[in-house]
Amino acid sequence: MAKDIVILGIETSCDETAAGVVKNGKEVLSNVIYSQINVHKKYGGVVPEIASRKHIEAISFVVEEALNEAKLSLDEVDAIAATYGPGLVGPLLVGLSYGKALAYAKGKPFIGVNHIDGHIAANYIGGNLTPPFVCLVASGGHSHIVYVKDYGEYEVMGKTLDDAAGEAFDKVARALGLGYPGGPAIEKAAKLGNMEAIEFPKSFMEEGNFDFSFSGVKTAVLNYLNRQKQKGEEVNIYDVAASFQRNIVEVLVKKLVEAARFKNVSKVSIAGGVASNGFLRQKLEEDAKKFGLSVYYPEKIYCTDNGAMIAAAAYYDFVKGKFSGMDLNAIPYLKIGESDC
């Protein structure tokens, strides 16, 4: 019987200090997340310098807690992995440096993981999804449609050319006075509104174009709010939230389903913070069913940034013998499919 492979994964690319221990790429032994949301909320977004300092304060405790929950010592871990990009350079350096230091001190293999690869790998946790499939990765910093040929082998079919989906959620939520983070705030408000109330524009909707542009709909919402204010008319923020959410979700789902049909695959998945949106999941299930597509998505705890997804992604590098050197540096604008290991 093959030996179990246990990997410690560390994630600090933005404002979550996270560590998780995963066995064989699927079984989560622990997943500890220290969120900085309450710290950044008053600024309406993540402040990189503050995020870096908070990561430094929390990283050792979070890693120790992850090992304790897994009931393992560092000596019992087969490899250590950490995100090295994309993300904010200061936060990335905290987790990357800590992970490399642990690996060096214990003589363990080290694996640098692409953050987007981690989000895709979250779909493997506790489930039976196997490549090939098409995955939508949508979060505050990323919006990609990725054809997953095999574990760790990708073709980017489309990406955002300006604002990411989650970024648009944050900016519109701020304009509506709904607070930060915008995704959950918009989703909550949308449940009280009429999604057909306002028709906002959609970009790049022609067939075969899998790229995104969300700056247009964001600007359209801001212009609508300004016009209503100038006319002295009351704004129904719930209708605006619902109409905006419908716009974003319809674009995401249309392009994902179309990309899957283009690649002639029978499976689609979603990942990233936006993947926890209930309306997105509902709409995808409905549209995918029309074309006989199976839908997969991670548990919501694995949609946000977490260490378990980094450990899961690293497992597939481990079995291929693909390790990183101690000279691996943070790459803030790392693209999926690129490797600097």
Curated annotation (Swiss-Prot):
Ribosomal protein as UniProt keyword: no
What EC number is given for this enzyme? Answer: 2.3.1.234
Its annotated compartments are:
Cytoplasm
**What molecular functions are annotated in GO for this chain?**
iron ion binding; N(6)-L-threonylcarbamoyladenine synthase activity
Q: Which UniProt keywords apply?
A: Acyltransferase, Cytoplasm, Iron, Metal-binding, Transferase, tRNA processing
Catalytic reaction equation(s): L-threonylcarbamoyladenylate + adenosine(37) in tRNA = N(6)-L-threonylcarbamoyladenosine(37) in tRNA + AMP + H(+)
Which cellular components does GO assign to this protein? cytoplasm
Which GO BP terms, alphabetically? Answer: tRNA threonylcarbamoyladenosine modification
The portions of this protein that span the membrane are none
Enzyme category, top tier: transferase
Q: Where does substrate bind?
A: 137-141, 170, 183, 277
Q: Which cofactor does it need?
A: Fe(2+)
Residues the entry annotates as binding Fe cation: 115, 119, 305
Q: What InterPro entries does the record tag this protein with?
A: ATPase_NBD, Gcp-like_dom, KAE1/TsaD, TsaD
Q: Give the NCBIfam families listed for this entry.
A: gcp_kae1, T6A_TsaD_YgjD
Q: What does this protein do?
A: Required for the formation of a threonylcarbamoyl group on adenosine at position 37 (t(6)A37) in tRNAs that read codons beginning with adenine. Is involved in the transfer of the threonylcarbamoyl moiety of threonylcarbamoyl-AMP (TC-AMP) to the N6 group of A37, together with TsaE and TsaB. TsaD likely plays a direct catalytic role in this reaction.
Record's family? Belongs to the KAE1 / TsaD family.
What name goes with this protein? Answer: tRNA N6-adenosine threonylcarbamoyltransferase
